[in-house]
């Protein structure tokens, strides 16, 4: 089974179990060293604690065992964790919550010969992102159509 199919199956199975105040941010599955790792990224307002991740792990693990047929080709380690400072912005809702924050955006197609922008998200209306970024020493604004965004995440401003 392809890794993207595993991620889709896992996401569909665990989403109903991750309820308010928690938010499912992302699911990743892949090899880390010699082991397969299923990473479930979860967050909540004010941040997630170690106890939260332990409780969610106990809730999620039995759900994964009910997926039939078993989508995992090999044994894997389950990791329930915080998305960290550079959390991915995978949905339009996540992008909307990031208005006013410093973000990193990769595009499918270039705008003004650039495919990567890093700056402050000024607004998002569901269709277009408006960002302010530094071009050498000058501040510039760019309008990015949402459908051209390949990846977006929060970024740490240095």
From Swiss-Prot:
UniProt-annotated location(s): Cytoplasm
Cellular component terms (Gene Ontology): cytosol
Name of one Pfam family that matches: RimP_N
GO annotation, biological process: ribosomal small subunit assembly; translation
Main location: cytoplasm
Keywords annotated in UniProt: Cytoplasm, Ribosome biogenesis
Top-rank taxon: Bacteria
Cited NCBIfam families: PRK00092.1-2
Name of the protein in question: Ribosome maturation factor RimP
Lineage of the organism: Bacteria, Bacillati, Bacillota, Bacilli, Lactobacillales
